[in-house]
Swiss-Prot record:
The modification Phosphoserine is found at S34, S77, S79, S101, S103, S107, S617, S646, S724, S731, S733, S881. Residues 158-174, 208-217, 345-374, 527-539, 693-703, 722-737 have a biased composition (Pro residues). The modification Phosphothreonine is found at T638, T654. The modification Asymmetric dimethylarginine is found at R1100. Residues 129-152, 416-437 have a biased composition (Polar residues). Residues 476-491 have a biased composition (Basic residues). Transmembrane segments: none annotated. This is Atrophin-1. Its main location: cytoplasm. Residues 240-253, 262-273, 378-396, 547-584 have a biased composition (Low complexity). It comes from Mus musculus. A mouse model of DRPLA with 129 CAG repeats (Q129) exhibits severe neurological defects similar to those of juvenile-onset DRPLA patients including age-dependent and region-specific presynaptic dysfunction in the globus pallidus and cerebellum. Progressive shrinkage of distal dendrites of Purkinje cells and decreased currents through alpha-amino-3-hydroxy-5-methyl-4-isoxazolepropionic acid and gamma-aminobutyrate type A receptors in CA1 neurons is observed. There is progressive brain atrophy. There is a cross-link at K1168 (Glycyl lysine isopeptide (Lys-Gly) (interchain with G-Cter in SUMO2)). The lineage of its organism: Eukaryota, Metazoa, Chordata, Craniata, Vertebrata.
C-alpha cells in the first residue's frame, strides 16, 4: 500500500499524471473499483467503480486503483461486513488498501457511507468510513478509524495495508471514533473504526501523536472545538458540539493553534459549531447525523459555520468565499496549522476542528455558502461523502484515504478524516473531501468537474456553486494552496508522504500538517469558506486551509474545496492543477492525484459520471460526486450528521441546511448535485441517506443528483452490508432439533439422524453413523483405536524415559558446572591473583587466542608446513571444519596456551600411548559426563572469568614478559574482556574447549574435550613433563618452528596488527603472543576490541586454513623465537603453574578445553612432528 501510495504520490506528484489517467483510469478504476466495489455491493461496486474511476483516475497509479478497489471494496465490504465480518473487514481492508485509490476511497467513501448508512445513516457513514477504513485500514484502521487513532496512527496511514491488517485497531479506532463521533457511539464506533481507520492513517500519518482516537477526535472536535463541534462532538454531539461551538475557540483550542484560528473560524463558525453540535445532536439523533456531526462536525459546523465561517471566512477573506476562504484557509491554516500542527495529532479530531473551521469555512463559503454550504452540504454530505470518498479515496489511497473515508464516514471523521484522513491523505482526502464535495457538488457533475476543474481552474470552481465558491476559492487557492500546499505538501508532504500524507502535510505544517491536520487543517479548511461548502472540503479546505495557510489561503480555500484534495496538495494539484498535481505528486499525490486527479477525474468522473459517479459517487466521485451527492447523499447520509448536527443547526435539514449553505454558495450549482441530492433528497436522503445510507436507498437518496447513478450504487452498496449480514442470517431453515433417530442402515453401518433441520439437512453435521459390530468398518475402527492407544502408551513411555534422561543430564550438567566452577576458581585463584587484573580475565583468552590466532591465521597455515596441514587434517573434520570454526582447532590450538601446548604436546605425545589411551578413556568418560550439556552455559559465563584468566594467564605468563610487558596484557585482558565477549569469548570457547564453545556440537565438543583431556591428562598429570615440554620440547619445537613459522607468524602478526581482523587474530591468536607483544596495546587490544566478532570470523576462516599450521607456529612463531623462549623461560614456572591450573581448569571445564584438544592434538602432533623434524 505504501508503495502504491508512494507511487500514487509520485503519480500525484507528477501533478496531473494521475489526473490525466483520471478519466481513463477513472473508467478503469471504476472497473477495478467495481471489483472491489462489487464485492461490496452493486451500488457500492458502481459507486466504487465511479469513485474508483475518479479516484483511480486520480490514483490510477496501481496503488491507487488497487487501493481504490481495495479501499472501496474494503470500505464497502467493511461497511457491509463490518459487523458481520471483521475478518472480511480485514480482508476487505487489505483489499481496500490495495486499491486505496481515491476511487476506492470514494467507493469506500460512498460505500462507507452506504454501508455506514446501512448501519446507521450517519453513523454508518462514519461507520463505514470508520468501518471501511477500519476494515480497510485495520492496520491503519485505527489510523483511519480513529481520527485520534488515525492521527496517532498517522504513520499507519501511509501504510494503508497495515491498517488493513489491523482490523482490530479499527474497532479500537472505531471506538475512539465513537468518542470522536461522540455523537453516534454506535455508528461512531464502527465509523470510528472506519472513519478513524481512514482518518487515523492520515491522522496517524501525519499525526502519529493522536494515537488516541479520542484525542484525535477530541482534537477533531477540539479542532472542531474550533468549530465548537469538534470539542462538542467529542463532548457530546450536541452539547459537545454546542459547547464546542461555543468552546469551539476553546475546544478548538484543544489544538489551540489550529483551534485558535479555527476558533476564529470556529468563533465565526461558532454558530456553525453550535450548529454542529446540533449536527451532533441531530447527528446523534440521526445516526447518520450523529457521525456526521462527529464527522460532520465540520460539516455541520460547516453548515452553521458557513455563516459563522462566513464571518470567519470573511474575516479570513471569506467574503469571496474564495478570497476569504484563502484567508480562512490561512486562518484555518493557522488553526489547521496550529491545530493541525498542534492538533495534528488531534488532527483527525481536527476534522471536527475543521468542522468548526469548516464552519468558519462555510461562512467563508458563506460567500459561497451555497457551494460551501453545499459543500457543507456536500461537505456535510459531500464531506461525509467526500470524506467518505475522500476518506475512501484517501483511505484507499492512504490511511488518510481511510481517514477520509472516515470522515466521509462521518464528517467528524471526515473532518477528522479530512484532518485525520486528509492529514495523511490530506490533499487527497481534502481534495476528495473537497473534490468529493466538489464532486459532491458534482452532483452537479459540472461542479464535480468544475470542482475538479475549479480545483484545477478556479474559474470552473465558481461554476461549482457552493463548491464553486469553495472550490473556486479552492481552485485558486487550490492552485495556490495546491501549489503551496503542494509546496507544503510537496515540500512538507512530499517527504512526509511516505510517512504519511498527513505528515507531508504535517510537514508542510502550514497547511500540510494542517491538511494532515487536515482535521485541524480541515478545521482550518472548514473555517475555510469552501469548508462550508465542503465541510469535508473544509476538511480539504482545512487541509487546504492548512495548505492555504501554508502557501495559499486560496489554496486554503481551494484547500477547503480541494483541500480535501488540496489538503493533500497532491489532490489539489490534480484537481486543481499542476500544483495540485504537484502537491499531489507528493504523498497526497496518490491521494491528491487521486484526490485531485481523481477529484478532477472524480470530479470529471463525477461530472462525467456524476450519475454513475454519483452513483459511483459513493464509490469514487461520490467522493466528490458523492460528496456532492454525498453531500446530498452524504448530506443525506452525513447531512443527518450535518443536518441533524450542524445542518439542523445550520442547515437543519442538512440537505436543506446544506442546501442552505450549499445553495447559498451554489445551491443551484452545488445544489444541483448536492442540493439536488442533498437539498431535496438530501435532507431526506441526507438523514435518510445517511440514515438510509445504511439502506441502499439512502445512498441513492444520498445522491439524488447523483441519485441516478449514485442511488443505483448506493443501494447496492447498502445492500452489500446487508448482504454480508444476510449470510450470517443464513437460512430460513428451522432451528435444528435433536432427534437421534436411525435413518438408514447399510451392511456395515447404521446412520442416525442426530439433528433434524426440517427441510434442510447436512449430512456432515446432522447425521452420524455407527459401524455395525461385525462389519469391516467396525474392525477397522477398533484396530485404529487400539493402534492409537498403543501408540499413545508408547509415546508416554518414551516421554517418561526422555524426561528421566533429561533429569540425569541436568544433574550431570549441574555437576559439571560445579566442577567447572571449582576448577575455574582454582585456576582463577592460582592465576587470577597474579595476572587477574590484566591477564586474569584475559589470560584464558590469550592462551586461546594464541591458539585461535594460530587456527585463525590462515597465512600461517598456508605458509606453514604441509606436514602440519596434513596433521591438522586429522582434527580438521571437527576442529577445522568451518562448521566447527569455533572448534578447539581454533582455540584448541590456542585453547591450551601455545606454550602449554608446546610443553604439553611432547608430554602428551611422548607419553605412553597405552597410558595415554587409558587416560584418555578415563578423561573421556569424565569429560563426557561433565561436557554433556552443563558446560555450554557455564563456559560462557566462566569463560570471561575463568576461561579468560586461565588462557590469558597462560599466554601472557608464557609470553608473560612479552604479553605482560608490552602492557597489551592489560589491554588484552580488558580489551579482551570487554571485547572478549565476542572475540575472546569465542577464543575462550575454542581454547576453553567445547564447554565454552557453543558453536561446537556436543559430539565435537566431546571429541575435542576428550583429546584435550587426554593431552591435558598426559601433560597435566605430569607437571614436570609439562614443564619439560614447555621448556624443552616447546622451545625445541618452537625454535624449529620459530624458524619455519616465525616469518609467517611474525608476518601474520604484522598482518594481524595491520589488518583489523588479523591484528586481533594474529596478535591475539596466531601471532597472538608475540604479535601481541609487538603490537600489544594498540594493535592487539584494539583489534581485539574491534574484532571480537571479526576474530571469530577470522578464526573460522583463517583458523580452518591455518589453525594447525598456526598452532605450532602460534606457539613458537607468534612470538619471536627469542621472545617465545624468553617468555617460556621467564614463565616456565608460571607456565607450569598455568599448565597445572589450566589442566585443572580444563578438567573442570573439560568441555572448554576439550574442543581445543582435537585441534591441539593435531597441533601437538604437528608440533611433535615438526619438533622431531627440526630436532
Amino acid at each position: 500500500m505504501k508503495t502504491r501510495q508512494n507511487k500514487d504520490s509520485m503519480s500525484m506528484r507528477s501533478g496531473r499524471k494521475k489526473e490525466a489517467p483520471g478519466p481513463r483510469e477513472e473508467l478503469r478504476s471504476r472497473g477495478r473499483a467495481s471489483p472491489g466495489g462489487v464485492s461490496t455491493s452493486s451500488s457500492d461496486g458502481k459507486a466504487e467503480k465511479s469513485r474508483q474511476t475518479a479516484k483511480k483516475a486520480r490514483i490510477e497509479e496501481p496503488s491507487a486503483p488497487k487501493a481504490s478497489k481495495q479501499g472501496r471494496s474494503e470500505e464497502i465490504s467493511e461497511s457491509e461486513s463490518e459487523e458481520t465480518s471483521a475478518p472480511k473487514k480485514t480482508k476487505t481492508e487489505q483489499e481496500l488498501p490495495r486499491p486505496q485509490s481515491p476511487s476506492d476511497l470514494d467507493s469506500l467513501d460512498g460505500r462507507s457511507i452506504n454501508d455506514d448508512g446501512s448501519s446507521d445513516p450517519r453513523d454508518i457513514d462514519q461507520d463505514n468510513r470508520s468501518t471501511s477504513p477500519s476494515i480497510y485500514s485495520p492496520g491503519s484502521v485505527e489510523n483511519d478509524s480513529d481520527s485520534s487513532s488515525g492521527l496517532s496512527q498517522g504513520p499507519a496511514r501511509p501504510y494503508h495495508p497495515p491498517p488493513l491488517f489491523p482490523p482490530s485497531p479499527p474497532p479500537p479506532d472505531s471506538t475512539p471514533r465513537q468518542p470522536e463521533s461522540g455523537f453516534e457511539p454506535h455508528p461512531s464506533v464502527p465509523p470510528t473504526g472506519y472513519h478513524a481507520p481512514m482518518e487515523p492513517p492520515t491522522s496517524r500519518l501525519f499525526q502519529g501523536p493522536p494515537p488516541g482516537a479520542p484525542p484525535t477526535h477530541p482534537q477533531l472536535y477540539p479542532g472542531n472545538a474550533s468549530g465548537g463541534v469538534l470539542s462538542g462532538p467529542p463532548m457530546g454531539p450536541k452539547g459537545g458540539a454546542a459547547a464546542s461551538s461555543v468552546g469551539a475557540p476553546s475546544g478548538g483550542k484543544q489544538h489551540p493553534p489550529p483551534t485558535t484560528p479555527i476558533p476564529i473560524s470556529s468563533s465565526g463558525a461558532s454558530g456553525a459549531p453550535p450548529a454542529k453540535p446540533p449536527s451532533a445532536p441531530v447527528g446523534g439523533g440521526s445516526l447518520p447525523s450523529a457521525p456526521p456531526p462527529a464527522s460532520f462536525p465540520h460539516v455541520t459546523p460547516n453548515l452553521p459555520p458557513p455563516p459563522a465561517l462566513r464571518p470567519l471566512n470573511n474575516a479570513s477573506a471569506s467574503p469571496p468565499g474564495m478570497g476569504a476562504q484563502p484567508i480562512p484557509g490561512h486562518l484555518p491554516s493557522p488553526h489547521a496549522m496550529g491545530q493541525g500542527m498542534s492538533g495534528l495529532p488531534p488532527g483527525p479530531e481536527k476534522g471536527p476542528t475543521l468542522a468548526p473551521s469548516p464552519h468558519p469555512l462555510p461562512p467563508a463559503s458563506s460567500s459561497a455558502p451555497g457551494p460551501p454550504m453545499r459543500y457543507p452540504y456536500s461537505s456535510s454530505s459531500s464531506s461525509a461523502a467526500a470524506s467518505s470518498s475522500s476518506s475512501s479515496s484517501s483511505a484507499s489511497q492512504y490511511p488518510a484515504s481511510q481517514a477520509l473515508p472516515s470522515y466521509p464516514h462521518s464528517f467528524p471523521p471526515p473532518t477528522s478524516m479530512s484532518v485525520s484522513n486528509q492529514p495523511p491523505k490530506y490533499t487527497q482526502p481534502s481534495l476528495p473531501s473537497q473534490a468529493v464535495w466538489s464532486q459532491g457538488p458534482p452532483p452537479p457533475p459540472p461542479y464535480g468537474r468544475l470542482l475538479a476543474n475549479n480545483n484545477t481552474h478556479p474559474g470552473p470552481f465558481p461554476p461549482t456553486g457552493g463548491q464553486s465558491t469553495a472550490h473556486p476559492a479552492a481552485p485558486t487557492h487550490h492552485h495556490h494552496q495546491q501549489q503551496p500546499q503542494q509546496q507544503h505538501h510537496h515540500g512538507n508532504s512530499g517527504p512526509p508522504p511516505p510517512g504519511a500524507y498527513p505528515h507531508p502535510l504535517e510537514s508542510s505544517n502550514s497547511h500540510h500538517a494542517h491538511p494532515y491536520n487536515m482535521s485541524p487543517s480541515l478545521g482550518s479548511l472548514r473555517p475555510y469558506p469552501p469548508g462550508p461548502a465542503h465541510l469535508p472540503p473544509p476538511h480539504g479546505q482545512v487541509s487546504y486551509n492548512q495548505a492555504g495557510p501554508n502557501g495559499p489561503p486560496v489554496s486554503s480555500s481551494n484547500s477547503s474545496g480541494s483541500s480535501s484534495q488540496a489538503s493533500y496538495s497532491c489532490s489539489h494539484p490534480s484537481s486543481s492543477q499542476g500544483p495540485q498535481g504537484a502537491s499531489y505528486p507528493f504523498p497526497p499525490v496518490p491521494p491528491v492525484t487521486t484526490s485531485s486527479a481523481t477529484l478532477s477525474t472524480v470530479i470529471a468522473t463525477v461530472a462525467s459520471s456524476p450519475a454513475g459517479y454519483k452513483t459511483a459517487s459513493p464509490p469514487g466521485p461520490p467522493q466528490y460526486s458523492k460528496r456532492a451527492p454525498s453531500p446530498g447523499s452524504y448530506k443525506t447520509a452525513t447531512p443527518p450528521g450535518y443536518k441533524p448536527g450542524s445542518p439542523p443547526s445550520f442547515r437543519t435539514g442538512t440537505p436543506p441546511g446544506y442546501r442552505g449553505t450549499s445553495p447559498p454558495a451554489g445551491p443551484g450549482t452545488f445544489k444541483p448535485g448536492s442540493p439536488t441530492v442533498g437539498p431535496g433528497p438530501l435532507p431526506p436522503a441526507g438523514p435518510s441517506s445517511l440514515s438510509s445510507l445504511p439502506p441502499p436507498p439512502a445512498a441513492p437518496t444520498t445522491g439524488p443528483p447523483l441519485t441516478a447513478t449514485q442511488i443505483k450504487q448506493e443501494p447496492a452498496e447498502e445492500y452489500e452490508p446487508p448482504e454480508s449480514p444476510v449470510p450470517p442470517a443464513r437460512s430460513p431453515s428451522p432451528p435444528p432439533k435433536v432427534v437421534d433417530v436411525p435413518s438408514h442402515a447399510s451392511q456395515s453401518a447404521r446412520f442416525n439422524k442426530h439433528l433434524d433441520r426440517g427441510f434442510n439437512s447436512c449430512a456432515r453435521s446432522d447425521l452420524y453413523f455407527v459401524p455395525l459390530e461385525g462389519s469391516k468398518l467396525a474392525k477397522k475402527r477398533a484396530d485404529l483405536v487400539e493402534k492409537v492407544r498403543r501408540e499413545a502408551e508408547q509415546r508416554a513411555r518414551e516421554e517418561k524415559e526422555r524426561e528421566r534422561e533429561r533429569e540425569r543430564e541436568k544433574e550431570r550438567e549441574r555437576e559439571k558446572e560445579r566442577e567447572l566452577e571449582r576448577s575455574v576458581k582454582l585456576a582463577q585463584e592460582g592465576r587470577a591473583p597474579v595476572e587477574c587484573p590484566s591477564l586474569g580475565p584475559v589470560p584464558h583468552r590469550p592462551p586461546f587466542e594464541p591458539g585461535s590466532a594460530v587456527a585463525t591465521v590462515p597465512p600461517y597455515l598456508g605458509p606453514d608446513t604441509p606436514a602440519l596441514r596434513t596433521l591438522s587434517e586429522y582434527a580438521r573434520p571437527h576442529v577445522m571444519s568451518p562448521g566447527n570454526r569455533n572448534h578447539p582447532f581454533y582455540v584448541p590450538l590456542g585453547a591450551v596456551d601455545p606454550g602449554l601446548l608446546g610443553y604439553n604436546v611432547p608430554a602428551l605425545y611422548s607419553s605412553d600411548p597405552a597410558a595415554r589411551e587409558r587416560e584418555r578413556e578415563a578423561r573421556e568418560r569424565d569429560l563426557r559426563d561433565r561436557l554433556k550439556p552443563g558446560f555450554e552455559v557455564k563456559p560462557s559465563e566462566l569463560e570471561p572469568l575463568h576461561g579468560v584468566p586461565g588462557p590469558g594467564l597462560d599466554p601472557f605468563p608464557r609470553h608473560g614478559g612479552l604479553a605482560l610487558q608490552p602492557g597489551p596484557p592489560g589491554l588484552h585482558p580488558f580489551p579482551f574482556h570487554p571485547s572478549l565477549g565476542p572475540l575472546e569469548r569465542e577464543r575462550l570457547a575454542l581454547a576453553a574447549g567445547p564447554a565454552l564453545r557453543p558453536d561446537m556440537s556436543y559430539a565435537e565438543r566431546l571429541a575435542a574435550e576428550r583429546q584435550h583431556a587426554e593431552r591435558v591428562a598426559a601433560l597435566g598429570n605430569d607437571p614436570l613433563a609439562r614443564l619439560q615440554m614447555l621448556n624443552v620440547t616447546p622451545h625445541h619445537h618452537q625454535h624449529s618452528h620459530i624458524h619455519s613459522h616465525l616469518h609467517l607468524h611474525q608476518q601474520d602478526a604484522i598482518h594481524a596488527a595491520s589488518a583489523s581482523v588479523h591484528p586481533l587474530i594474529d596478535p591475539l591468536a596466531s601471532g597472538s603472543h608475540l604479535t601481541r607483544i609487538p603490537y600489544p596495546a594498540g594493535t592487539l587490544p584494539n583489534p581485539l576490541l574491534p574484532h571480537p566478532l571479526h576474530e571469530n570470523e577470522v578464526l573460522r576462516h583463517q583458523l580452518f586454513a591455518a589453525p594447525y599450521r598456526d598452532l605450532p607456529a602460534s606457539l613458537s612463531a607468534p612470538m619471536s623465537a627469542a621472545h617465545q623462549l624468553q617468555a617460556m623461560h621467564a614463565q616456565s614456572a608460571e607456565l607450569q603453574r598455568l599448565a597445572l591450573e589450566q589442566q585443572q581448569w580444563l578438567h573442570a571445564h573439560h568441555p572448554l578445553h576439550s574442543v581445543p584438544l582435537p585441534a591441539q592434538e593435531d597441533y601437538y602432533s604437528h608440533l611433535k612432528k615438526e619438533s622431531d623434524k627440526p630436532l
